[in-house]
Amino acid sequence: VLRIPFMCNLGTKEGVSVTDGRFSKVWPANRSFFQALRSRGGLIGVAVDPLTSHECGNQRYLAIPWLDVCLAARLPNEIGEPLKPMPDRDVWLSDPTGKEAVAASEFEGKKLEAGWLPNGEIAIHWMEYVTDTGVPDVTAPPAPLEVTLDGKRLTWRANADPESGLSQFKI
């Protein structure tokens, strides 16, 4: 379990900045889980959504790239082979409820009390997310396929990637 990457994602109003009320025990429970794993070298981070409580906010903006990086690192080359271990060459660390992350080699605190981030790319997304949840998507959506003009009728087939989606068309 300690070698499996985890990310705890909760809203700030779940006991981080609001410490009473219906969801105030979410952060203490997450903190206990985080500390139990991280103190033993577990690969676990915390991403606090600064805008929400218990509802689903913009978590996907961090979750999708985080999962992409972790899956790309762990999936085997051949079907049936075991999962690969997470690489540790570009790990970044953060205060679990903070807003800044640094390369592990530059981290000055207690590393086994710090939030774990798999690499610099995710650390940048994490810092954007915990600041205002505004993780920009820098990937272009796939180009349309089977574009056909029949008289005045233009048709095409489009595939949306999970990160970019399709917010608009420009013709």
Where are these regions (language model features)?
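Primarily recognizes the serine-hydrolase "nucleophile elbow" in alpha/beta-hydrolase
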Residues: 1-4
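C-terminal catalytic histidine-bearing segment of alpha/beta-hydrolase fold enzymes
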Residues: 9, 35-142
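Residue-level signal for short, function-critical loop segments
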Residues: 12, 50, 160
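Acidic catalytic loop of the alpha/beta-hydrolase fold
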Residues: 12-24, 53-54
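Well-ordered, non-membrane alpha-helical segments in soluble/globular domains
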Residues: 22-33, 63-65
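Pro/Thr/Ser/Gly-rich low-complexity, intrinsically disordered linker/stalk tracts
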Residues: 128-166
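Short beta-strand elements bearing conserved aromatic residues within extracellular beta-rich modules
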Residues: 169-171
